Amino acid sequence: MSQAAPAVRPLPAVYAPVTERVGPATLVRGPIGPVESALRLGLGLAWTGLCTLGFLVVLIALLPSRVARINVGNVYGSFVGKGCAWLTGSRYLIHNRAAAHAERPAIYVANHASLIDIFLGAWLSPMNLCGVAKKEIIYYPFFGQFFWLAGHLRIDRGDRGKAVASLKALADIVKKNALSIFIWPEGTRSKDGRLRPFKKGAFHLALSTGLPIVPMVIAGSHKAWEARSLRLSREQVDITVLPPIDTSGWTKETLDEHIREVEAVFAAALPEDQRPLAAAEPARRAA
């Protein structure tokens, strides 16, 4: 028989106290049936569509200004993301959210193991932030088209030259307009929830902009909504915003070392079942 989960499950000591909660106060963990899963996902799609239509008028009026559109996208993301998270039926505990609203721009990086992570990132991102996602996000109903129209960046992971050029252009826009960036450093979703080696794109952005890196650690989302599945499960998902990592002393020569340091920060903050296995590190893509 399923048991009610404790208010906060045991997590690594780096986790700050809970500052926000979305979802049931008392959680009974376990799979959600196919009919209820379909209903919840359908309601999530309907909520996303409703928000898209509501914000689209504002977005069209601001087409001449990319920065203004980016900010409309940030507000839109907070509505869509929080609503979709609530509709999954899981409980989301936010730790140290204030760290995601620092006055200084930053590069926010998060691990990625579930489709719901995209909505969590959209919900918790501060204003004046440009998101970076794979080009295929355009095919996500409503959300992907709005992401593109709002001026956020889509990159072609299959074409390194184009990806690098896009990130260089983004660095110029960020420096000119004092924007933050949100990027998934693993480059793709983890199939089993375990942390994957980070690609270099986010860290080249740190070098070219001088912005600090703010880790956003997501624990448990791979159980709430498994990768490549339409079945949901009632789980507890913890999202912690960790203190910023200064990048002002980074150089190209020490970049690989700094990437490993940031990976270690994530690994230490994740539960044991999401830490990378002790195995040889796969080769990184240059981008």
Residue ranges of model-derived segments:
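Non-catalytic C-terminal accessory region of glycerolipid acyltransferases
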Residues: 1-31, 35-38, 164-287
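Catalytic core of membrane glycerolipid acyltransferases/transacylases, capturing the structured
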Residues: 52-74, 78-79, 85-88, 100-160
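A generic local structural motif
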Residues: 92-96, 116-118, 167-169, 225-227
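Generic preference for hydrophobic
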Residues: 94, 108, 131, 239-241
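Conserved beta-strand termini and adjacent loop/short-helix elements that scaffold enzyme active sites
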Residues: 95-97, 134, 155-157, 242-244, ...
